[in-house]
């Protein structure tokens, strides 16, 4: 009612903001409604001012420039340097938005709509957006474009921020830096204007003549006050609905132009008239009625605008309706409430009433002393003013005669510039009642909302309640009128949503049915197009087998078949042929337990094939699949069986009954009925054909090795057996633990086959050293120094001036006294005892192997014994290293020796040579891994040298990755290796470990499924639709712990491979299931391929699976660190290794072997490790290309190794982040005052604080940012190994769940990684995530699709490369 009136110097936007803010102060106290209450806070209102008290003046403070925020968090964030800012070039930003919008147009599929949407929820969403001060049209566009696609409030905000221009965004959302004052609302408001704000209850006042004590105001001031009153009235009429619901922002008020608004309304009015005329012609009464309502609404608002003080009369338009129709006269109750807000002068009001001759509202408010003993309203008002306004004079009462009735004008001076004047329109029969009624109305205005009316006489109490009820009704009517367009829009939108929801429910069964079908060309086809054709065996019948049977009979009659048949008959397994075949006819599952060398791997599949082809009865299938754990086994066994069958064309030839299939290589034909394949190939076949419909017999060989793939395959086969009664399963194992497999398959029969072996004499390390005369030098690389780790110490150095400087140094710490020697070794020489005590058991002594080989040829005991030497080594690197030593040692130059390396990555010719007998007088030396334990048999081996080491897949909790680590073998494996020496005659086994160590070996190796991460297994389970991984793996032979499975699923969710709430693969997960590598490495490789940098990424991935090529010799740590620092690049250990690799390749190409060796020595690099990196890199690249991805020709086309450019580094760091996330931490930058002082880099990770390892190039890094790390290890403290400094873009593009905090201008990743960003940029990154998923989905649907010219990838690549450039 009454408002504060203060002199203004000039009308303007600030005054408008001040006045409107005053009119809304009370509504601001209620807060925003709906989701805005909890999720997106709006600005806090000013504290309420007690009635009658003066408002405190806001103290002028220093101006602060920052991104405008709705609360303190945003501002504080801007002051925190550790929260990095994200900025995109303006032109690039516009292009990215164009790509996003284009993608949305092309992919306009509507998402699932929530069935719980209601009009109330839509209204809450509408009002929440309205509370953010978005315009009505923008709100409606946003809701239409997002809710119909399954969106919510966040989706609508994202749409608005992405599609509105910066100047169209409300305050707090725009991208520009804005000026703000602490705790000021509205912004940029001067102290003088703020002081004029009136309390919420005084927004409806009537200006009367001034008190003589108050100085008369100038005409200019009156105009300004009129402007303020007009704004208050307009705000009241337009925004009545906001009372009690929430405060609205000031964007529209700050930019309000009545003339522009008037012209807009005039245009809309003309449109509405044309629409009404059209409806009239169409006789559409409903449409005509709606159009008339619009016309009336526009006209009312235009009339209001015409009263604006700065309205330009030149643009005023005359319309008939405006001239004819006048606003309806207010009711007496409304007049009594003075709800018109802006009454004209008393004289004008009486004159108007006189003209209209309206009947007066005359009432009697008399009450007796008996009915009321309290104060009268007049006395109550006087006492209230004295108490609450002690500096103000007593209220004045001016009686006004209206005919024979009375009313009273009451005047209350609240302050020098604030006078409340009220005059009720209700008339009384005497002057005293009029004074009491005026006092009641004054109290109603002064203490509105309080229960003062209970202290008044009953008659005045009733009129008070009457006023209150009428005011509420009026507010409700105004609210309904104002909200009518909104409610109409919500009703239409809700109707559309329900219609779309019904359509989705009708289409869902069809889509689910279609979704179960495999795409026409699925991703498995690109594992190897021809490979899967080999496993896609055609269904066979008796007629189909006729040509094959005829072929087999022809082969049986060949001399080659008959000659090899005699050799087969000498094998131990051959005499069990009939029992094996008969048992298989009676039982569907059989376990064949045979010793190594019994011939089971070649003969059991051969027996089955012969029986099925020679059996003329029935029309049984004949498609046999025999799985092998290694590729070399599959190839060599298939080759041998082909020879035994008499096939001249070899495996997979035109007239061959036997073939093989390994990764990226297939040898099979139409006549193939026996297929040897790796376990992984059959698992991929199961992803395509879950029941193996075309297979009649499955033979799983080497099940005793308990690889994770074979255990997984057994679970699937056990379930298939319950669904297919015609499938037969044969498990072939060494004699170890065969009963366990029988029990797993409901106590199926076991056929035990003895082996053919001769006695083997065993020599242990102590015997070998004693006999060969080997001397272990103290400076030898194989001599144990008992060094465990380096300890960090702090040294205080006092300078001449008395200052103290601290230095951090690392000194080697010994583990203590040397271990005591077992008394058992006292019988050996002191030289042997010294060797046993100090020889490093964890390092293979290649020098000792050379001495032993020489000893075999020189000692009288062995030099006359013919036979091959089989050396068991842990991996390819050791094979290559020993091969190089033998090749360069002149003692082995002569033709007396034939050195053969046996490994699955080597050529087929080299592998074939291992199985051939050498010429007489030539000693064959075969270097092999544990594949020679049981997988293959080299027929002429007499000597076995067992290093006792093997490589096992092991999970590292520190890096959440698995890798092949070197470890000791089990007793069972050692005995298998020993047995290889006794196949043709009495043999000899030389163990390069002591007898005491052998006794400490485990009896059996731990099943792989219990010691490796299960991410890859979970991917296969979900890919094959086998249900929940937890439920499926509980059926395994040795079920892993639920926590391990849960960890695997959590990691898959983190990297985006499966859906967050169900065991279902995402597009990325579908691709990762096609790569038999660790999921983190797989993700790196996929992103490396799609961003055109597969070669360097494959090298980085190889580094993660193998050990670092950098070495630190004892006593040369400083030199090694200096050499590593010279190769350091881009604050990254990973890129430093790649830089070293590039230098090695360059030296290799330019200077040959000598230059290569010199480069490695100069930079402290292990050449063997670099060779291993090269081999693993090539293998990984083959895997990725086989899965349908190819690297960019531009990168592969580079001539020779080149230095990394800035753009290359940015791209490689982004791909590293894609693979290693969430192994990331925030650098706790603590810059020292002394520039020479080096502080260790401290990092805050999600699990706590850690320190960068001393071996890292980032050890002394001190800057704000985020650090990727490969591994987290705990020594005396927690260290991060292999780290890389990354920028915000990679984290935002490839990190965890991203959330946009619109008002705070913050981006959060996984709820703890924060970046500052204008809201539009924040939404861009959120949308780019969706685009990356869409690219992967398209690639999944069409594996042959080229990604080289994809617009989405091009724009993302450009974005990454231009960061900070």
UniProtKB/Swiss-Prot annotation:
Q: Name one GO molecular function term.
A: translation activator activity
Q: Where is this region: Disordered?
A: 1-74, 174-222, 235-257, 500-524
Q: Which GO terms describe its cellular component?
A: cytosolic small ribosomal subunit; eukaryotic 43S preinitiation complex; mitochondrion
For bias kind Basic and acidic residues, which ranges apply?
Answer: 206-222
> What Pfam families does UniProt report for this protein, alphabetically?
DEAD, DSRM_DHX29, HA2_C, HA2_N, Helicase_C, OB_NTP_bind, UBA_DHX29
Xref: SMART domains = DEXDc, HA2, HELICc
Keyword NAD present in the record's keywords: the answer is no
Give GO terms for biological process.
formation of translation preinitiation complex; positive regulation of translational initiation; ribosome assembly
Enzyme superclass (EC)? hydrolase
What InterPro entries does the database record attribute to this sequence?
A: DEAD-box_helicase_OB_fold, DEAD/DEAH_box_helicase_dom, DHX29, DNA/RNA_helicase_DEAH_CS, DSRM_DHX29, HA2_WH, Helicase-assoc_dom, Helicase_ATP-bd
Which residues of the sequence carry a binding annotation for ATP?
A: 594-601
Q: Where in the cell is it found?
A: Cytoplasm
PANTHER family in the record, alphabetically? ATP-DEPENDENT RNA HELICASE (PTHR18934), ATP-DEPENDENT RNA HELICASE DHX29 (PTHR18934:SF264)
Can you name this protein? ATP-dependent RNA helicase DHX29
- PROSITE patterns, alphabetically? DEAH_ATP_HELICASE, HELICASE_ATP_BIND_1, HELICASE_CTER
Occurrences of domain Helicase ATP-binding (ranges): 581-754
Keyword tags: ATP-binding, Coiled coil, Cytoplasm, Helicase, Hydrolase, Initiation factor, Nucleotide-binding, Phosphoprotein, Protein biosynthesis
Q: Has keyword Nucleotide-binding?
A: yes
Q: Which domain of life is it from?
A: Eukaryota
- Provide the coiled-coil residue spans: 281-308
How does it associate, per the subunit comment?
Part of the 43S pre-initiation complex (PIC) that contains at least Met-tRNA, EIF1, EIF1A (EIF1AX or EIF1AY), EIF2S1, EIF2S2, EIF2S3, EIF3A, EIF3B, EIF3C, EIF3D, EIF3E, EIF3F, EIF3G, EIF3H, EIF3I, EIF3J, EIF3K, EIF3L, EIF3M, DHX29 and the 40S ribosomal subunit.
Instruction: Please note every region of biased composition (Basic residues).
Output: 1-10
Every copy of the Helicase C-terminal domain together lies at 848-1025
Query: Briefly, what is this protein's role?
Result: ATP-binding RNA helicase involved in translation initiation. Part of the 43S pre-initiation complex that is required for efficient initiation on mRNAs of higher eukaryotes with structured 5'-UTRs by promoting efficient NTPase-dependent 48S complex formation. Specifically binds to the 40S ribosome near the mRNA entrance. Does not possess a processive helicase activity.
């Amino acid at each position: 009612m009454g408002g504060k009136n203060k002199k203004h110097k000039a009308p303007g936007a600030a005054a408008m903001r001040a006045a409107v803010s005053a009119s809304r102060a009370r509504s601001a106290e209620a807060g925003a409604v709906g989701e805005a209450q909890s999720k997106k806070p709006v600005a806090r209102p000013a504290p309420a001012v007690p009635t009658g008290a003066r408002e405190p003046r806001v103290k002028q403070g220093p101006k602060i420039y920052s991104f405008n925020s709705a609360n303190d968090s945003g501002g504080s964030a801007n002051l925190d340097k550790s929260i990095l800012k994200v900025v995109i070039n303006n032109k690039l930003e516009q292009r990215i938005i164009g790509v996003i919008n284009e993608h949305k147009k092309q992919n306009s599929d509507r998402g699932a709509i929530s069935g719980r949407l209601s009009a109330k929820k839509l209204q809450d969403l509408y009002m929440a957006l309205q509370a953010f001060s978005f315009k009505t049209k923008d709100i409606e566009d946003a809701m239409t474009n997002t809710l119909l696609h399954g969106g919510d409030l966040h989706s609508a905000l994202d749409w608005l921020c992405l599609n509105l221009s910066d100047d169209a965004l409300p305050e707090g959302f725009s991208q520009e830096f804005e000026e703000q004052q602490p705790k000021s609302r509205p912004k940029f408001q001067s102290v003088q204007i703020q002081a004029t704000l009136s309390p919420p209850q005084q927004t409806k006042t009537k200006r009367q003549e001034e008190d003589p004590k108050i100085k008369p105001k100038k005409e200019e001031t009156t105009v300004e006050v009129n402007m303020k009153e007009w704004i208050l009235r307009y705000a009241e009429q337009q925004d009545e609905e906001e009372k009690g619901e929430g405060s609205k922002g000031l964007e529209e008020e700050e930019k309000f132009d009545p003339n522009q608004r008037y012209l807009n309304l005039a245009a809309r009015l003309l449109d509405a008239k044309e629409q009404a005329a059209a409806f009239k012609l169409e006789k559409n009464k409903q449409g005509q009625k709606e159009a008339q309502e619009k016309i009336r609404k526009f006209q009312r608002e235009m009339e209001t605008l015409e009263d604006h003080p700065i309205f330009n009369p030149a643009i005023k338009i005359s319309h008939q309706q405006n001239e004819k129709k006048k606003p309806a006269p207010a009711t007496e109750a409304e007049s009594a409430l003075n709800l018109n807000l802006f009454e004209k002068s008393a004289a004008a009001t009486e004159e108007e009433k006189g003209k209209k001759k309206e009947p007066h509202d005359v009432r009697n408010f008399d009450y007796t002393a008996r009915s009321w003993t309290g104060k009268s309203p007049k006395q109550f008002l006087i006492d209230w003013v004295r108490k609450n306004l002690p500096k103000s004079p007593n209220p004045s009462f001016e009686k006004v005669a209206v005919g024979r009735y009375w009313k009273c004008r009451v005047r209350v001076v609240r302050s020098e510039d604030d006078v409340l004047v009220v005059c009720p329109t209700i008339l009384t029969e005497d002057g005293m009642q009029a004074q009491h009624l005026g006092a009641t109305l004054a109290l109603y205005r002064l203490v509105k909302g309080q229960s003062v009316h209970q202290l008044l006489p009953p008659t005045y109490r009733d009129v008070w309640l009457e006023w209150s009820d009428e005011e509420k009704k009026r507010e409700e009517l105004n609210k309904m009128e104002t909200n009518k367009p909104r409610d109409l829009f919500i009703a239409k939108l809700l109707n559309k949503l329900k219609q779309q929801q019904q359509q989705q429910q009708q289409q869902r069964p069809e889509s689910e049915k279609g979704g179960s079908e495999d795409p026409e060309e699925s991703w498995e086809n690109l594992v190897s197009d021809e490979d899967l054709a080999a496993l896609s065996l055609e269904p066979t019948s008796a007629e189909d087998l006729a040509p094959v049977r005829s072929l087999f009979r022809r082969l049986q009659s060949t001399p080659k078949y008959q000659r090899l048949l005699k050799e087969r008959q000498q094998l131990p397994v051959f005499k069990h042929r009939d029992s094996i075949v008969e048992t298989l006819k009676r039982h569907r599952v059989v376990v064949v337990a045979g010793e190594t060398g019994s011939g089971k791997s070649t003969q059991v599949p051969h027996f089955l094939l012969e029986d099925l082809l020679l059996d003329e009865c029935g029309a049984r299938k004949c498609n046999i699949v025999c799985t092998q754990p290694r590729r070399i086994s599959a190839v060599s066994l298939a080759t041998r069986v082909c020879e035994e069958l008499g096939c001249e064309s070899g495996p997979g030839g035109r007239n061959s009954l036997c073939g093989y299939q390994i990764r990226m290589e297939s040898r099979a034909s139409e006549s193939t009925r026996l297929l040897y394949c790796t376990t992984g190939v059959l698992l991929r076949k199961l992803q395509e054909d879950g029941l193996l419909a075309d297979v009649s017999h499955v033979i799983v060989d080497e099940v005793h090795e308990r690889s994770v793939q074979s255990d997984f395959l057994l679970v699937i086969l056990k379930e298939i057996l319950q669904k297919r009664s015609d499938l037969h399963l044969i498990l072939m194992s060494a004699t170890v633990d065969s009963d366990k497999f029988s029990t797993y398959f409901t106590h199926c029969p076991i056929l035990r086959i003895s082996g053919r072996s001769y006695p083997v004499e065993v020599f242990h390390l102590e015997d070998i050293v004693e006999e060969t005369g080997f001397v272990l030098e103290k400076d030898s690389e194989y001599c144990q120094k008992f060094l465990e780790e380096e300890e960090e110490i702090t040294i205080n150095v006092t300078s001449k001036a008395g200052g103290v400087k601290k230095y951090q140094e690392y000194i080697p710490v010994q583990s203590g006294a040397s271990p005591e020697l077992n008394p058992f070794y006292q019988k050996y020489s002191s030289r042997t005892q010294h060797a046993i005590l100090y020889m490093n058991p964890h390092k293979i002594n290649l020098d000792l192997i050379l001495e032993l080989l020489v000893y075999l040829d020189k000692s009288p005991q062995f030099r006359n014994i013919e036979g091959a030497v089989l050396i068991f080594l842990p991996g390819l690197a050791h094979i290559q290293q020993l091969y190089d030593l033998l090749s360069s040692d002149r003692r082995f130059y002569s033709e007396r020796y034939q050195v053969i390396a046996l490994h699955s990555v080597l050529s087929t010719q080299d592998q074939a040579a291992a199985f051939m007998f050498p010429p007489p007088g030539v000693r064959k030396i075969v270097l092999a891994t544990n594949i020679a334990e049981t997988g293959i048999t080299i027929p002429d081996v007499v000597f076995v040298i067992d290093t006792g080491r093997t490589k096992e897949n092991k999970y590292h909790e520190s890096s959440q990755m698995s890798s092949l680590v070197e470890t000791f073998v089990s007793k069972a494996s050692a005995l298998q290796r020993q047995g290889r020496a006794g196949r043709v005659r009495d043999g000899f086994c030389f163990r390069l470990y002591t007898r005491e160590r052998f006794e400490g070996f485990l009896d059996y190796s731990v099943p792989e499924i219990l010691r490796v991460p299960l991410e890859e297994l979970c991917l296969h389970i979900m890919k094959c639709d086998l249900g929940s991984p937890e439920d499926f793996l509980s059926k395994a032979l040795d079920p892993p712990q639920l926590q391990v499975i849960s960890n695997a699923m959590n990691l898959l969710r983190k990297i985006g491979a499966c859906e967050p709430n169900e065991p279902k693969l995402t597009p990325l997960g579908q691709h990762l299931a096609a790569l038999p590598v660790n999921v983190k490495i797989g993700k790196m490789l996929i992103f490396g391929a799609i961003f055109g940098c597969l070669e360097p990424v494959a090298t980085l991935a190889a580094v993660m699976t193998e050990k670092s090529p950098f070495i630190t010799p004892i006593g040369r740590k400083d030199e090694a660190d200096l050499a590593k620092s010279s190769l350091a690049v881009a604050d990254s250990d990973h890129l430093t290794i790649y830089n070293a690799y590039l230098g090695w390749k360059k030296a290799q190409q330019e200077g040959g072997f000598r230059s290569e060796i010199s480069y490695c020595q100069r930079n402290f690099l292990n050449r063997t490790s670099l060779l291993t990196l090269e081999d693993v890199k090539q293998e990984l690249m083959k895997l990725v290309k086989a899965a349908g991805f190819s690297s960019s020709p531009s990168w592969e086309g580079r001539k020779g190794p080149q230095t990394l450019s800035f753009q290359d580094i940015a791209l490689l760091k982004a791909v590293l982040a894609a693979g290693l996330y969430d192994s990331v931490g925030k650098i706790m930058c603590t810059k020292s005052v002394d520039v020479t002082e080096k502080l260790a880099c401290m990092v805050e990770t999600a699990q706590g604080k850690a320190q960068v390892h001393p071996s890292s190039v980032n050890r002394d890094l001190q800057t704000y940012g985020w650090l990727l790390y490969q591994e987290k290890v705990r020594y005396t403290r927690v260290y991060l190994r292999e780290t890389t400094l990354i920028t915000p873009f990679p984290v935002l593009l490839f990190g965890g769940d991203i959330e946009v905090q619109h008002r705070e201008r913050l981006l959060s990743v996984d709820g703890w990684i924060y970046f500052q960003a204008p809201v539009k940029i924040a939404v861009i990154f959120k949308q780019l995530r969706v685009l990356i998923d869409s690219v992967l989905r398209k690639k999944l649907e069409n594996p042959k699709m080229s990604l080289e010219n994809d617009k989405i990838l091009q724009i993302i690549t450009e974005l990454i490369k231009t960061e900070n450039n």
